[in-house]
Amino acid sequence: MPSETLWEIAKAEVEKRRCHGSDGDGMEIGEKSVFFIGSKNGGKTTIILRCLDRDEPAKPTLALEYTYGRKTKGHNTPKDIAHFWELGGGTSLLDLISIPITVDTLRTFSIVLVLDLSKPNDLWPTMENLLQATKSHVDKVTMKLGKANSKASSEMRQRMWSVMQKDHPDRELIDPFPIPLVIIGSKYDIFQDFDPEKRKVICKTLRFVAHYYGASLMFTSKSEALLLKMRGVINQLAFGIDKSKSMCVDQNKPLFITAGLDSLCQIGSPPVPDSDIGKLQAHSPMELWKKVYEKLFPPKSTSTLKAIQDPARDPQYAESEVDEMRVQKDQELEQYKRSSSKTWKQIELDS
C-alpha cells in the first residue's frame, strides 16, 4: 500500500481536530486569538508590537488589522500561534467586530479593551459602545454555537464564571463578560498628573466596571516596568501563560487587578455625596456609576466621538494615479448631481 501524501496526512489531522472539537470534551485549543478594541489613538498598536517584540513604528489602524505571533512551549514542541486582531477608529467601526468572531473561532477569543486615560470625557462612551457591541455579537454567536454544539456552549459559560470563586461575596451581583476580558488604561504617565479627586473617580469607576464584567484591569504607560506587566497579561491570553496574582488598588499608583480578586466592598460606593445618590434615579448599579462619572466628566457629542477622517484624503495612503482618478470621478459625480437637479426642476415646471 503506497504511503500517504503530505496533503492526505494534513487533511486527516484537520478532520481529527474537527471531530475532537465537536465532542466538546474540554479540548485544549493550541491557537488563541486576542481582539484589541478601544480608544482611537489609545495605543493599541503599540501594545501589540511590544508583545510581539517588534521594533517598528506604530502606524494608525485604518479599519481592522491582523497579525500573529508564535511562542515555543518547550524543546522539540511545536510553537503555539496567537492571532492578534485590532479594531481601529474608536467607536466608528463597530460593524467590523463581527468579522473575526465567528462560531468557529469564538472559543479561542479574548478581548482587550484599551482606554485612553488622558481623555476622561471620552472614556465612558467609548467603553460602553464597544463593550455593548462586542457583547451583543458574542451573545448571538454563542446562541448559534449552542445549537450546533450544546456541550461547547455549556463549557464556555462555565469558563465565564470560573474567574470568580464560588464563595466570593459578589458572585450574585456581577455579570461576567461572555469571553475573557482585560481592560487596559493607557497613557498613565499623563493621567498621574490629574487632580487627585478626578483620579479617584476614574480609578473607582474602572474598578467597578472591570469587577462587574469579571475582567482584569491594569494601567500602563511608557514605563518599562508597566510594559512588562502588560506584556505578561497579554501573553496569558495569547499563550496560556500563568496568571499574575499581584494586585495594586492604590489610586496613587498604576492599578493592577487580576479578574476575580477585587470586591465591591473594597471598591466602595460611587464617589458622590449620599444626599445626591437618591437624586440620580438609576435603575441599576452600572447606570448609577455612569451617572456619577458623567457628572464629573460629561461626554462629548457622539458625532465628535464617531468622527473619522476620510482615509481617501489621508496623505499616509497617497496613491497619485488613484487620487487623480478619484478627483475626476468626484467632479463627474458633482456634474451629474447638478444635471439631475436641473432635470427634476424642469419636470416640476412642466407639470
UniProtKB/Swiss-Prot annotation:
Signal peptide location: none
Origin: domain of life: Eukaryota
Composition skew (Basic and acidic residues), residue ranges: 323-335
Family matches, as SUPFAM superfamilies: P-loop containing nucleoside triphosphate hydrolases (SSF52540)
Compartments (UniProt record): Cytoplasm; Cell projection, Cilium; Cytoplasm, Cytoskeleton, Cilium basal body; Cytoplasm, Cytoskeleton, Cilium axoneme
Any Gene Ontology biological process: cilium assembly
Keyword Oxidoreductase attributed: no
Family, as annotated: Belongs to the dynein light intermediate chain family.
Quaternary structure (record): Light intermediate chain of the cytoplasmic dynein complex 2, a multisubunit complex composed at least of eleven different proteins. The cytoplasmic dynein 2 complex consists of two catalytic heavy chains (HCs) and a number of non-catalytic subunits presented by intermediate chains (ICs), light intermediate chains (LICs) and light chains (LCs).
Descriptive protein name: Cytoplasmic dynein 2 light intermediate chain 1
Gene source species: Rattus norvegicus (Rat)
